[in-house]
A protein has these predicted regions:
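C-terminal catalytic domain of Rieske-type non-heme iron oxygenases
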Residues: 1-168
Length: 168
């Protein structure tokens, strides 16, 4: 049963937090088990989890409108405990320093290379080329915006009007 699974995840994370001093008492049950994601600006997504925050940024290619750059960053609170290991689905390399003393190097990968992003971001990255291809489909008639995105879009339209920026 799905509720039993969610409850077990929540309970397990709370027990682990107490054992390792992670401070998860600040989180609701839903924040412990569910993926809380939000978009800011049209090209940035933030996935919030107790273990870390994923930042994903999509930038247009400088010369080819059929291409884009996909940047990801994983931010986490330092944990000074040798027994702590981030969940494997987060895609952090084994033996990642979670103490905050050493910053992991920036890595770059091309489209056909496996960046080892982990289960969640790996699935997202694998899906992106087909999304980009769909943008050129004859059936594509424009984006469907959720309420948050509509508000952001409206804000930027109004801001550009007030700044006197010509809209295309």
């Amino acid at each position: 049963d799905l509720l039993d699974v969610r409850s077990a995840i929540q309970q397990g994370k709370r027990e682990r937090s107490l054992r390792l001093g992670l401070g998860y008492e600040r989180f609701t049950d839903g924040q412990l088990s569910d993926s809380w994601a939000t978009g800011i600006f049209p090209n940035i997504q933030i996935g919030c989890h107790p273990e870390a925050i994923f930042l994903m940024r999509f930038l247009p290619h400088d010369t080819d409108p059929q291409k884009f750059w996909y940047d990801t960053m994983t931010l986490m609170f330092p944990v000074d405990d040798p027994n702590y290991c981030p969940p494997a689905w987060m895609g952090l390399p084994e033996n990642t320093d979670v103490t905050g003393r050493n910053r992991a190097p920036t890595e770059s990968y091309l489209k056909d290379e496996d960046p080892g992003l982990g289960l969640v971001l790996g699935q997202d990255a694998a899906f992106l080329p087909s999304v980009q291809e769909g943008m050129s489909s004859k059936a594509f008639q424009g984006q469907l915006w959720g309420e948050q995105e509509q508000r952001l879009r409206h804000f930027h339209v109004e801001l550009e009007k007030r700044l006197g920026i010509q809209q295309s």
